[in-house]
Design a protein with these regions (language model features):
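Bilobed "Venus flytrap"/periplasmic-binding protein-like clamshell domains
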Residues: 43, 47-71, 83, 129-198, ...
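An extracytoplasmic/periplasmic, membrane-proximal ligand-sensing/linker region
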Residues: 29, 33, 40-49, 54-65, ...
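A ligand-binding cleft/hinge motif common to bilobed small-molecule-binding domains
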Residues: 104-114, 172-175, 201, 206-234
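Bacterial signal peptide processing site
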Residues: 20-23
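C-terminal motif of bacterial Sec signal peptides marking the signal peptidase cleavage site
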Residues: 15-18
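Extracytoplasmic small-molecule ligand-binding "clamshell" domains
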Residues: 34-108
Length: 314
């Protein structure tokens, strides 16, 4: 009597197993929405270091579309590597990145140190391939001129490698007879330009150094409520789209590590130069695309005259 019962049990187990194995592939092949599909390129990952002037998350949100476009065009995986002011040098030295995209001052400092090749220059809506720096104070601070900055508390992004977040303004003020390093009561570093603006607004700092377009972007994002809370010192009288204090300088360069494969370098250069002006990834960074490299000799002059990082590089 036990044998027939065992036979029946085994029979049903075999049927259940067969049904289960037949149903499994159907689960794996369930449809995926078209919007989430993405081609998977082959080959080693290409690493693009992007200077994160706000945060790593913001860098990924802003420039992720550019990276995805490069990946699509060259047929290889491309990884965005957010860079601090410090590791844009250390990762270049270690070979941890194949390309860099950073501010022009740091870009030229990296070039002087590691012999990178500048491929293109970023161009932005309304301003093209140039930008500038602002010297901002709280409108209610009582500060109305550069001379009033003596004895005050100032801040900038980085005193060695930040372009429109520091060095453009330092040079401008020194040319006007005010040295932030000796004439300010304090001159500190604040890595985030958002925090510089907010610090000036709430009185933590008397004066802050930021790039053109920073105030307008924060206004669009409702991080600040009005531009009327700020005064721009020594505002230039020209037809540049944004108000600014300093001279105009070339925008961010996109450069290649000297050991990056030449064929890949040419592919990336061509990809960026031919990127459609209306591509959503460019809209995300307020850009119209990339142009042939501008003349960065002004960066060399700043580096050497102020003896900044790489000033003595051979």
């Amino acid at each position: 009597m036990p044998k027939p019962r065992l036979t029946i049990i085994i029979f049903f187990l075999l049927i259940f197993s067969a049904c289960t194995s037949q149903n499994s592939p159907a689960i794996e092949l369930s449809p995926t929405p078209v919007s989430t599909l993405r081609a998977q390129p082959t080959g080693d990952s290409v690493k693009v270091g992007v200077l994160a002037i706000r945060s790593a998350a913001a860098a990924n949100a802003q420039y992720g579309g550019i990276i995805a476009y490069i990946e699509e065009q060259i047929g290889q995986p491309v990884t965005l590597v957010p860079l601090t002011q410090e590791d844009q040098f250390s990762l270049m030295e270690s070979g941890g990145i194949d390309f860099t995209f950073n501010n022009p001052l740091a870009g030229i400092q990296v070039q002087r140190t590691f012999n990178t090749e500048i491929l293109v220059t970023l161009a932005r809506n309304n301003t093209g391939p140039t930008f500038s720096g602002l010297i901002i104070v709280n409108k209610n601070s009582g500060i109305t001129s550069i001379e009033d900055l003596k004895g005050k508390n100032g801040t900038c992004v980085n005193q060695q490698t930040a372009a429109a977040g520091c060095i453009f303004q330092v040079h401008h003020l020194q040319q006007k007879g005010v040295d932030p390093f000796t004439d300010f009561n304090s001159f500190t570093e604040t890595p985030s330009q958002d925090n510089i603006v907010l610090g000036v607004l709430n009185g933590s700092f008397d004066v802050g150094f930021i790039r053109t377009g920073q105030l307008e972007r924060m206004l669009r994002e409702n991080t600040i409520l009005t531009l009327d809370d700020f005064l721009i010192l020594d505002q230039a009288e020209d037809d540049f789209f944004f108000p600014h204090s300093t001279a105009l300088y070339p925008e961010w360069p996109f450069a290649a590590h000297p050991d990056t494969d030449p064929e890949l370098v040419n592919q990336v250069r061509k990809t960026l130069l031919e990127m459609p002006e209306d591509h959503p990834a460019l809209t995300e960074i307020n850009s119209t695309g990339f142009v042939e490299p501008l003349d960065y000799s002004a960066m060399h002059e700043l580096i050497e005259s102020l003896q900044l990082k790489s000033w003595d590089a051979q």
